[in-house]
Curated annotation (Swiss-Prot):
Effect of deleting the gene: Deletion of just fapF in an overexpressing strain yields cells without amyloid fibrils. Deletion of the entire fapA-fapF six-gene locus shows no visible growth phenotype.
Protein family per UniProt: Belongs to the amyloid transporter (TC 9.B.153) family.
Protein's recorded name: Functional amyloid transporter FapF
Taxonomic lineage: Bacteria, Pseudomonadati, Pseudomonadota, Gammaproteobacteria, Pseudomonadales
Ranges of Gly residues composition bias in the record: 92-101
Region of interest called Disordered, as start-end residue ranges on this chain: 62-114, 203-223
Length: 430
């Protein structure tokens, strides 16, 4: 009896246990799902906060004005025109917001850097930055020449018998240039230039101390600051640069003989050396009227700017009361200075928005001058022809929107050219 009851109890318990387990399992799964759902909600809230922060940053960026693209430094006028047409097309076809900001960016980019404008001014000689401009410039030129004089003959084609004399001339020239310019409609330019010249020359020669070839003597002559030859010019810009054509300017310059002419200046013999003759004064001008037509071209090949110029100077014939250099002698006559031809080519680069640098070579070729004493015929002046070649290194520095600093170094490459010439100009635009 007891065994049957125990068996029945075991059977009942075995049937009830799986049912209790089945009811307990869903409770555990629900708790797990609730925990996972809570974690997902927390992640969602964190993501929502992150999205809100990102959205706020995007709005701040959109509210800021668009930053224009960097300016091209060596941009030609042809590019300016193309940029202008692109701006018009963008504003006409673009959207209300994106099109206007993009067009404004192109408009800002179409404006040339100030260094490029200064570069064009110096290369073409046409200053179009303002209606009026005034330029102050200082120029220093150094000239040092030696001449070997042989008085004797060669023996056995290799031995020189006689006297050897070495002559030397050292000259320092300072010029203060005052130039005023007027620009009319960025097409015509009128200018006048007034130079103030200071000169000092030192002459050396052997044969001092009674003709001793080993002894040398020297004499110095100076000229106080004096106005030189005033000149004025007219320039016309007849061609604007395009994709295929350069910027072209034609000019005419007239020089008046307002300085001290070199004719009639007497050569005085040195008291210490019979071989040395020095002028009693120094000239500050040519003494004759001259006219110089010229042409200058400028073309952009980004990032470089190529430029070139050519000019021809014709000196007018004139008469003087005295053309002799002998002391106590006065001879009137006519003077015909030799005409000159000058050309130059170079390349320039814009270093940044305020500075540019240029390199160029130039050459001046002058014909011989002639004199005609009263009652005589025309006579050519010995060694009056010249060939002066230069290598030029220049810069433009935009000190402000109105003031530019232009240093330039010219190195003489031929015997007729000064050893070097350094100039510093300060054009100011009103």
């Amino acid at each position: 009896m007891h065994r049957s009851l125990s068996l029945r109890a075991v059977v009942c318990l075995s049937t009830l246990l799986p049912a209790s387990l089945l009811y307990a399992a869903p409770d555990v799964d629900i708790e797990t799902l609730k925990q996972e759902l809570l974690e997902l909600k927390q992640r969602y809230e964190a993501q929502q906060k992150a999205l809100a922060v990102l959205e706020q940053r995007v709005r701040q960026v959109e509210d800021q004005p668009a930053t224009p693209a960097p300016k091209r430094l060596a941009k030609s006028p042809a590019d300016f025109k193309q940029s202008g047409s692109t701006v018009a097309a963008s504003s006409g076809t673009g959207g209300a917001t994106g099109g206007s900001s993009y067009g404004q960016s192109l408009k800002d980019d179409s404006e040339p850097a100030q260094s490029v404008s200064n570069l064009y001014n110096e290369a073409s000689g046409f200053f179009g930055n303002g209606k009026f401009s005034f330029e102050t410039g200082i120029t220093y030129a150094r000239y040092d020449a030696r001449q070997l004089t042989l008085n004797g003959f060669l023996a056995l084609d290799s031995i020189f018998l006689g006297n050897i004399n070495l002559d030397r001339i050292k000259a320092d020239n300072w010029t203060l240039d005052l130039t005023g310019r007027y620009n009319l409609d960025n097409r015509w330019q009128f200018d006048v230039n007034v130079p103030v010249v200071y000169r000092e020359s030192t002459y050396q020669s052997g044969g001092a101390s009674g003709g001793d070839p080993q002894a040398t003597s020297e004499e110095s002559v100076s000229r106080d600051p004096t106005i030189g030859d005033v000149n004025f010019g007219i320039a016309y810009k007849f061609l604007d640069e395009s994709a295929t054509m350069p910027d072209a300017v034609v000019s005419v310059r007239v020089k008046a003989p307002t300085g001290k002419e070199p004719f009639g200046i007497k050569l005085v013999r040195s008291t210490a050396n019979d071989n040395l003759y020095v002028p009693e004064s120094l000239p500050t001008g040519n003494g004759v009227w001259s006219i110089t037509p010229g042409l200058s071209l400028v073309k952009t090949f980004d990032p470089a700017v190529l430029f070139g110029s050519v000019s021809y100077t014709h000196n007018l014939e004139d008469s003087f009361d005295d053309i002799s250099s002998d002391v106590n002698q006065k001879v009137g006559g006519k003077v015909r200075l030799g005409d000159s031809f000058q050309f130059g080519v170079g390349v320039a680069f814009a270093l940044n928005e305020r500075m540019s640098m240029s390199f160029s070579v130039s050459d001046l070729i002058q014909r011989k001058s002639k004199l005609k004493p009263d009652g005589g015929g025309w006579q050519s002046i010995v060694s009056s022809d010249a060939n002066a070649g230069y290598f030029n290194v220049g810069m433009t520095i935009a000190a402000s929107e109105n003031l530019t600093i232009v240093p330039n170094l010219a190195i003489g490459m031929t015997d007729d050219a000064p050893d070097f010439t350094f100039s510093l100009k300060f054009p100011y635009y009103f």
